[in-house]
Amino acid sequence: MTEKICAVDLGMPTLLEAAGAEESAALCAELGLQFVELNMNLPEYADPAHMDREKLCALREKYGVYFTLHLDERLDGCDFNPLVRNAYQETLRRALELAQEAEMPIVNLHLNHGVYFTLPGKKTDLYAERREEYLQHIDEMRRIGEEGADENTALCVENTDGFLAQEKKALDLLMKSKRWGLTLDVGHMHSAGYVDDDVYIVHSGKLRHMHLHDALLMQAGQCHLPLGEGNLDWRDSLRTAEMRHCRAVIEVKTLSALRDSVKTLREAGK
C-alpha cells in the first residue's frame, strides 16, 4: 500500500473507468487513499438492498480501505407524489442498513430543489410555496436517519448551487439531530460564489465530510477540475478538513484527473 498523503483520510469517487467495487478499492490502495465513495447513480450501486455486504467487508480487509456512500442525486424524500416519496424514503432506509452492515461512516446526499414554475417576471419553487408540507417530509427524513444510523454513521447534506430559503429551514431542522451533518463541497461553493457561507457558519459544528476539487470562481461549468487547475485555495480547504477532523473525497471525474490531483497533493507536501 502506498504511503498516506496527509493527516486527513482522503478518498476517491466512483469513476466510470473503474466502477466496480474491487477495481475501485485496488486503485484506492494503489494511490495511497483511504476510502472509496460509492455512487448510487451508477447501476452497480442503485439499490443498496442488492449490494453484497460480505464482498465490501472482504475488500475492506484485502485492500485496507473502506467505503462511504453517495445517494442518488435525484433522491427526493419530499416529492408530492406519495409513491415517489415513499420509494425515495425506503431507498434511504436501505442505504442506512447497508452503511451499518458494511461499516460506512458517511452517507452523503443532496437536497432536491423540486419543481418550479416559470411565471411572468419570476420563478416559483413549489417547495417554497408549500413550505410547511415540505418541512413535514424533511422531518420524516430526519427521523429515518435517527432510526437507521448509529453513532458511527453520519448522514451528510452536500451543498450544490446554493441552498434555497426553504432548504435552509430544512437544514435548521436536520442539524438538530446527532445523526445528521454537513458535507462541504468546496468546488461547488467556489463556483457558486460562496452563497452558502452563512449556512456553514451557522452550522459550523456539523461539518463531517468534504468534497475536494479545484474550480473557477463563479463558473459553474468549470467545477470538478483537478487540483491545481483552477483558482480555488484547496490547501486552505485541506487545513479546514484537518481542523474539523473531516474526511475528504478528491471528487474529480476521470482517472487521469484523480492521478494528477494525487500527484499535486504529494508534491505540495500534503
Where do the language-model regions lie?
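Active-site acidic/histidine proton-transfer and metal-coordination neighborhood
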Residues: 20-22, 81-181, 235
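N-terminal pre-domain/capping segments
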Residues: 1-94, 100-101
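Hydrophobic "anchor" residues on beta-strands that sit immediately upstream
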Residues: 33, 66, 154, 181, ...
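Histidine-acidic metal/acid-base catalytic patches
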Residues: 2-6, 18, 22-29, 78, ...
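Short acidic/His/Gly/Ser-rich catalytic and metal-binding motifs that mark active-site loops
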Residues: 76, 115-120, 218-219
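Active-site beta-loop-alpha junctions enriched in small/polar residues
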Residues: 13-17, 39-43, 72-74, 112-114, ...
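Alpha-helix-loop-beta-strand connector modules within alpha/beta enzyme cores
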Residues: 53-74, 136-150, 177, 234-238
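Short, flexible/disordered intra-domain loops and linkers
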Residues: 45-48, 119, 123-125, 223-224
